[in-house]
């Protein structure tokens, strides 16, 4: 006896990948996510590979994972994949302190973000 299998969170022609602790603010990660929303998966990988943004490397890893999930787990055609969804949210925030003059200290906040990418198989027209 175990838990009942939970239903899929995405449709049958979709695959999902989530990056939960990407170092940097959600606002900066969203700039990278905007570059790939609605693009073909292969084109999106090329855009991220040549982007100057530091978070593009992490977003590229999540996108590659979504493509691999589509191919290996859901038997979808890799050439027909499109980035259907690229949503960004806040994750944890590491709190550090910085010592200042006269025995004082200030807070340093190091934010992390999460990225959820859904790729969908579309019919070639």
UniProtKB/Swiss-Prot annotation:
Any one GO BP annotation for this protein: translation
- Record GO terms (molecular function): rRNA binding; structural constituent of ribosome
Q: Do you know which Pfam families this protein is assigned to?
A: Ribosomal_L22
Per UniProt, which keywords does this protein have?
Ribonucleoprotein, Ribosomal protein, RNA-binding, rRNA-binding
The yes or no answer to whether the keyword RNA-binding is present is yes
What are the coiled-coil residue ranges? none
- GO CC, alphabetical: cytosolic large ribosomal subunit
How it assembles, according to the record, is: Part of the 50S ribosomal subunit.
UniProt similarity note: Belongs to the universal ribosomal protein uL22 family.
Q: What does this protein do?
A: This protein binds specifically to 23S rRNA; its binding is stimulated by other ribosomal proteins, e.g. L4, L17, and L20. It is important during the early stages of 50S assembly. It makes multiple contacts with different domains of the 23S rRNA in the assembled 50S subunit and ribosome. The globular domain of the protein is located near the polypeptide exit tunnel on the outside of the subunit, while an extended beta-hairpin is found that lines the wall of the exit tunnel in the center of the 70S ribosome.
Q: What's the protein name? A: Large ribosomal subunit protein uL22
What broad taxonomic lineage does this protein's source fall under? Bacteria, Pseudomonadati, Pseudomonadota, Alphaproteobacteria, Sphingomonadales
């Amino acid at each position: 006896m175990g838990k009942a299998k939970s239903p899929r969170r995405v449709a049958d022609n979709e695959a999902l990948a989530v990056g939960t602790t990407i170092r940097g603010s959600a606002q900066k990660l969203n700039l990278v996510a905007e570059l790939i929303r609605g693009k073909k998966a292969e084109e999106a990988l090329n855009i991220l590979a040549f982007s100057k943004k530091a978070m593009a490397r992490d977003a590229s890893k999540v996108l590659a994972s979504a493509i691999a999930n589509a191919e290996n787990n859901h038997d979808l055609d890799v050439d027909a994949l499109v980035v259907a969804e690229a949503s960004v949210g806040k994750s944890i925030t590491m709190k550090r302190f910085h010592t200042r003059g006269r025995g004082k200290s200030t807070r340093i906040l190091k934010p992390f973000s999460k990225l959820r990418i859904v790729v969908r198989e579309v019919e070639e027209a």
